[in-house]
Regions:
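General structural signal for secondary-structure boundaries
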Residues: 7, 77-78, 126, 140
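Residue-level signal for alpha-helical context at structural boundaries
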Residues: 45, 52, 59, 71, ...
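Structured, soluble extracytoplasmic/luminal domains of envelope-associated proteins
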Residues: 85-125
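Short leucine-rich amphipathic alpha-helices used at interfaces
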Residues: 3-5, 89-90, 146
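Eukaryote-biased recognition of C-terminal alpha-helical segments
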Residues: 111-155
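Membrane-proximal alpha-helical anchors
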Residues: 1-76
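Structural motif
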Residues: 75-88
């Protein structure tokens, strides 16, 4: 009888070990799926942040100010500068979100490269450089360093 109990106990241990392995595989798959879902949600949030800035161009006066800012942001009136600064704050906040999301590993490199290239074009324009000189203190230290390094290589 004791031998039979030992055999049952051994079988129970083997079944228990198999159950633990299956549970760990399930947890691993679930974590991977959750990570993918978070990455997709982050990308969707960034798209929403960026699309919100297109409403600015429904205002013909702002669109005209934007065109002026491409060549020389210093030519903008005080009102235009305030509008343009608010617009770029929205754009740069979206860029910072993308940057921090990518740095934390929650955005794939190929997605980041597309967004980063899009926003770099703004920074390299006269208006983008003007805004960064005026508004950079409103951003995280890591993001400030990143943008400063971009400007250092393009000037």
């Amino acid at each position: 009888m004791t031998r039979r109990l030992k055999e049952y106990a051994l079988a129970a241990e083997i079944i228990g070990a198999i159950a633990v392995v299956i549970s760990l595989i399930y947890v691993g798959v679930s974590v991977n799926q959750n990570t993918n879902a978070v990455m997709v949600a982050n990308h969707q949030a960034l798209v929403a942040l960026d699309q919100a800035t297109t409403d600015w161009f429904k205002d013909p006066d702002f669109a005209a100010a934007y065109i002026i800012s491409l060549d020389d942001a210093g030519k903008l009136s005080a009102v235009q500068q305030a509008q343009f600064s608010s617009y770029l704050a929205d754009k740069f906040n979206a860029w910072e979100f993308a940057f921090l999301t990518h740095e934390s590993g929650m955005m794939e490199d190929n997605i980041w490269q597309g967004w980063d290239g899009h926003y770099r074009m703004l920074l390299q324009q006269s208006g983008g450089r003007w805004f960064w000189g005026e508004g950079r203190e409103g951003f995280s230290p890591a993001f400030k360093s990143y943008l400063d390094s971009i400007l250092a290589t393009t000037e």
